[in-house]
């Protein structure tokens, strides 16, 4: 099922971009590529696909070379967009050393965000990870106030309070399930440490990327190109430094009986990363980094529920309640942003007079 979805999404992604290229000649694609709701829908679909694909790779074959997997995804992404550019379907700017130097901190933050995310998931259940990920939205929102002149309304603040409350409930449900076992509590707190590190690195990545996009006037494929090109060497270096490349572990990750299948699925997951890379940059560009993060948080709620059902996560009153409180926070925030946009639209004619 995961393979079929990946193939279909890849075909749709290719067809849509080809159609956009044709439409662009007639000036018909601008309304689509600059449409916020369309970018949000595309980001949701691609992020769900990416999560399912990665879970299939790591879960089905007990894969533990995460840095190497991410490096393969980056390499496949680069080859894919280079092929699309060669066919005249997409375009992006040529490599520039000065731009690469300015963009390198973003690539480093991307690697840090991915690594801390994988470490948090190693020690925390999927529902708890998902709920605590919402705290990133608060960091991004106040980062936008400082850097981009954003505004936090009373209703948005209320949604942030609900996010914090959902995290507290999730923590209580997690500790209630763990009990007083010292070893398990130690691993749990270690997971929370990685989770908070991931929240800060994720917020820094999104905010700095948005600021750099404004300064460099990067388009979506420019952002994808530099993110993958600069993160690839970092991922390879970190893989060889921190991951187990012994023959025993290699045989565990690439068993002879399904080695070809494992390699194929790794490449397929890299192809699916093209969609999430493009849609992430697209969503940040045409909406806001806070909206992008909130959409991602809401999009993770179905994954959190699947964690309760399929992944042996703690199922109790508190864990289930935390998911729905987090969802309620997302609804509150969506309504708050909608009201704020309407108010801004009404103020614009007055400001122009």
UniProtKB/Swiss-Prot annotation:
Cytoplasmic compartment spans: 1-31, 88-102, 149-154, 209-227, 284-290, 337-353
Topology of the protein relative to the lipid bilayer: Multi-pass membrane protein
Glycosylation sites: 260
Primary localization class, coarse: Golgi
Record key words, sorted: Cytoplasmic vesicle, Endoplasmic reticulum, Glycoprotein, Golgi apparatus, Membrane, Sugar transport, Transmembrane, Transmembrane helix, Transport
UniProt family annotation: Belongs to the TPT transporter family. SLC35D subfamily.
General function of this protein: Involved in the import of GDP-mannose from the cytoplasm into the Golgi lumen.
Assembly information from the UniProt record: Homooligomer.
Protein name stated in the entry: GDP-mannose transporter
